[in-house]
Curated annotation (Swiss-Prot):
This is Putative ankyrin repeat-containing protein TP_0502. Signal peptide: none annotated. SMART domains: ANK (SM00248). ANK repeats lie at residues 143-172, 176-205, 210-239, 243-272. Keywords: ANK repeat, Repeat. It comes from Treponema pallidum (strain Nichols).
């Protein structure tokens, strides 16, 4: 984030302190005395060169800036180039400025430091997105949701991280309404599931087809590794699918003693009934399996 600071002589005494504040927020600052810049008649000098690489133009005036042609010129150039134009309000006249309200951010002395902190964080996020999108295109991955979903299912962690850096959501669902985390579990992509969880994928997000959570998907296929990972990440073991079944019921159906014990240790409720009126305990009795019955507390 590169800030060009233009100031008049009436505020020259404040420049060093303001530059120190901006540098502390991670900004590269180049100060220019507006009178010197505007009156420079050197044939090698051009005002446009001063803002060539800038991302933000910051004005600091002791008097009304609307009367200054330098302010009008540089703010116009900055707006035309898509830069952010900032003006530190120090007088009543400046605070009452209306003509440039839609083009200029008016900052207060008491809060401008907080503004630059937040702005720098926003700038870094946007830059990270741009870099990631460029990297995706260079590797042959146009920035479409379908490509993101396909790389999740393929287990390409490096590319998925680029998609996430580029602004794609770890909570995205495919066209059928299945969350990308559930897709990773269904495809047996354990490392991908772990990465999505680390990048903020909601662990209890349900699929639209059968209202299964990722934990239920793991229980259905007996993936203890991912089930343990999800439970440690705070997944609810008592989420119920469209048929009323829970991950515990699915584990009982597979007679997976290890997974049943894992779910019970994390608070799975063996009394919850599905739409057939059977709970995990009910299925254990139905299977006439003493070990299952013991595990679910029959």
């Amino acid at each position: 984030m590169k800030v060009v600071l233009f100031y008049d002589q009436g505020r020259a005494h404040s420049v060093a302190a303001i530059c120190e504040v901006l540098c502390a927020q991670g900004c590269a600052v180049t100060p220019h005395a507006i009178e010197q810049v505007w009156n420079d008649t050197s044939p090698c000098s051009t005002p446009l060169a001063l803002v060539q690489d800038a991302t933000h133009v910051f004005f600091l005036y002791a008097h009304e800036p609307m009367r200054d042609p330098a302010f009008i010129f540089f703010s116009g150039v900055a707006c035309g180039r898509g830069m952010h134009v900032l003006l530190l309000a120090t007088t009543t006249e400046v605070r009452d400025i209306h003509v440039f309200r839609d083009l200029v951010f008016l900052l207060e002395e008491e809060t401008f430091e907080d503004f630059f902190r937040v702005e720098h964080e926003r700038f870094v996020r946007q830059k990270k997105k741009r870099v990631a999108r460029t990297a995706l295109l260079e590797r042959g991955y146009p920035c479409f949701e379908e490509n993101f979903i396909a790389t999740v299912m393929d287990g390409n962690i490096d590319i998925v991280n680029l998609f996430l850096d580029a602004g794609f959501s770890a909570a995205l669902k495919d066209a059928r309404g299945t969350p990308v985390l559930s897709l990773a579990v269904r495809e047996g992509q354990d490392e991908m599931a772990a990465q999505l969880i680390a990048r903020g994928a909601p662990v209890d997000q349900l699929s639209d087809d059968r209202a299964y959570s990722a934990l239920m998907e793991a229980a259905q296929i007996g993936n203890r590794t991912v089930a343990r990972l999800l439970l440690h990440a705070g997944a609810d073991p008592n989420v119920r699918g469209s048929n009323g079944q829970t991950a515990l019921v699915l584990a009982v159906g597979r007679k997976d003693h290890v997974l049943i014990r894992l779910l019970m240790d994390h608070g799975a409720n063996p009394y919850l009934e599905d739409k057939l009126g059977l709970s995990a305990q009910g299925y254990a009795k139905l299977f006439n399996d003493p070990t299952l019955c013991t595990l679910v507390g029959v």
